[in-house]
């Protein structure tokens, strides 16, 4: 949690594409929830972050049922807040995993 929080806070000072990569990288070392969250949260305001969040959400829905978390993360990264294609009520949407 400490590592992920530091990456998330650091990503805000980086460019959109770099922050999404950094956050995604830290997310892969944790649970599937963190992976889905990392995609959208890392993009903070960037189109790339939104794409990663949506893509991860769709992919994880086939194996871990995390589509709502991934979609929410992508929309948050794109500046649209909660409420993605999966409902936007996953534990990562407004939880501590994104440092929000």
Swiss-Prot record:
One GO biological process term: sorocarp development
Pfam annotation, one family: Coiled
Sequence segments annotated as region (Disordered): 1-29, 67-100
Organism the protein comes from: Dictyostelium discoideum (Social amoeba)
Bias kind Gly residues: ranges: 71-93
Descriptive protein name: HssA/B-like protein 37
Superkingdom field: Eukaryota
PANTHER family the record matches: HSSA/B-LIKE PROTEIN 1-RELATED-RELATED, HSSA_B-LIKE PROTEIN 1-RELATED
Family: Belongs to the hssA/B family.
